[in-house]
Amino acid sequence: MANLLETSIFFSSADKLLSFPPKNSQTHHLPFSAFINGGRKIRKSSTITFATDTVTYNGTTSAEVKSSVEDPMEVEVAEGYTMAQFCDKIIDLFLNEKPKVKQWKTYLVLRDEWNKYSVNFYKRCRIRADTETDPILKQKLVSLESKVKKIDKEMEKHNDLLKEIQENPTDINAIAAKRRRDFTGEFFRYVTLLSETLDGLEDRDAVARLATRCLSAVSAYDNTLESVETLDTAQAKFEDILNSPSVDSACEKIRSLAKAKELDSSLILLINSAYAAAKESQTVTNEAKDIMYHLYKATKSSLRSITPKEIKLLKYLLNITDPEERFSALATAFSPGDDHEAKDPKALYTTPKELHKWIKIMLDAYHLNKEETDIKEAKQMSQPIVIQRLFILKDTIEDEYLDKKTIVADETPKKEEEDTTIEDFLN
């Protein structure tokens, strides 16, 4: 009884029955009972036509070649076909009818079945190459073995990863963190190729959902890693500022970063956090507090000069009174688009993570300044409706667009960040 790989080799295209030179031709029905990766049924049975006559390769008959091979090659693997003849069929298919690597993968993706023949296939390639007198064909056989082995190794690695995921479906995030390098584009192409061999729509859908979960886990891991790397970069910049010979020099570095558009939200959060901590601390000296105050003021002044697009976007969103319209505008802001300013504020695009950072900066400014009632801007921004909309935007982004790990990573520098008023940013 043939399996899917055997039938695929003999019946390799929809419009052509592959058969040997006719003599005593026979018709066989090959039912498919093969399963892939733990029990998913494969395609239905097919009817093929072939004859059991001797095959000739460049003047050498299969009977003559068979005499020089070991016994495993003489074992019958399909009705009327020995292992040697079956491997010859694969070789002929890969060299002539389907010579592209992409086409080979459609056979090698059937891992459980391919592994039954792979060792003998490579052995047969070597035997054929050793006995071949045509130097061009000899080289083709050598190259075929090498190329197929390389693909075989890659697909085996993809299969191992897929099996680990299938055996531990609740640990996909942990697997993504441990084996991130293995979640390549080729892996997802392998999963797609595998799903195409499945007969049932439910099975295909299950594989598609699994691939989606893998993509989500990888994306979450990458976002977390990106957050850590961003914070490390911001920390290095902040330490460079603190190592300045004077306060004036430190403030000048901040202004220079702003002009170079390197005064990013992560660095601002660090500066604001340091100032807030120094301001509330009972152990920090007045000199240190004064230094952090000047750094904070320099940062606030620089922000007014560069006006990040996220601030412009927030100003636009906060002025929308209709909640549904505001939510729609938020979704539009996260849609792919050209990163440029336009007369229409809706043309401003950013990422959920970046806008979330700026909302936190503004809310922290409100919390720190609401007690300083002598500051005009803080009084103006104490209107509950504006703060309420900011909190709604923050919660919406966290619930709809951000992974929890990303939020936790971004919270690291948050605690009591800054003393800037919201109006300072919006005006």
Swiss-Prot record:
<feature type="coiled-coil region">
    <location>
        <begin position="135"/>
        <end position="168"/>
    </location>
</feature>
<keyword id="KW-0175">Coiled coil</keyword>
<dbReference type="GO" id="GO:0009941">
    <property type="term" value="C:chloroplast envelope"/>
</dbReference>
<protein>
    <recommendedName>
        <fullName>Uncharacterized protein At4g37920</fullName>
    </recommendedName>
</protein>
<dbReference type="InterPro" id="IPR040320">
    <property type="entry name" value="At4g37920-like"/>
</dbReference>
<dbReference type="GO" id="GO:0009535">
    <property type="term" value="C:chloroplast thylakoid membrane"/>
</dbReference>
